A protein has these predicted regions:
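Long, contiguous binding/interaction regions
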Residues: 13
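C-terminal binding/interaction regions
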Residues: 4-7, 16, 26, 55-72
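Amphipathic, hydrophobic secondary-structure cores in small proteins
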Residues: 16-52
Length: 72
């Protein structure tokens, strides 16, 4: 995905692989449908912060998805 690769290069960070892209898109869907739509990009941002601090992406996504699926 040239767009995401270009952004990653400009930010000086590692790009996303297909598994990471799929996990983040699934996260955005689950958050948007399980809470409010506006929470999807914000939750993705928080996952990025957690990953930047050393948490595994799948673990961070799992934590956030758990909140999205239990929100009433």
């Amino acid at each position: 995905m040239a767009f995401l690769d270009d952004i990653a290069a400009a930010l000086g960070v590692e790009g996303l692989d297909e598994r990471g892209i799929e996990a983040l898109l699934d996260l955005a869907r689950d958050v948007a449908h399980g809470t409010e739509r506006k929470n999807a990009p914000l939750a993705s941002y928080l996952v990025g912060i957690a990953v930047g601090k050393g948490m595994g992406m799948q673990d961070a996504v799992g934590v956030v998805t758990g909140f999205a699926k239990t929100d009433d």
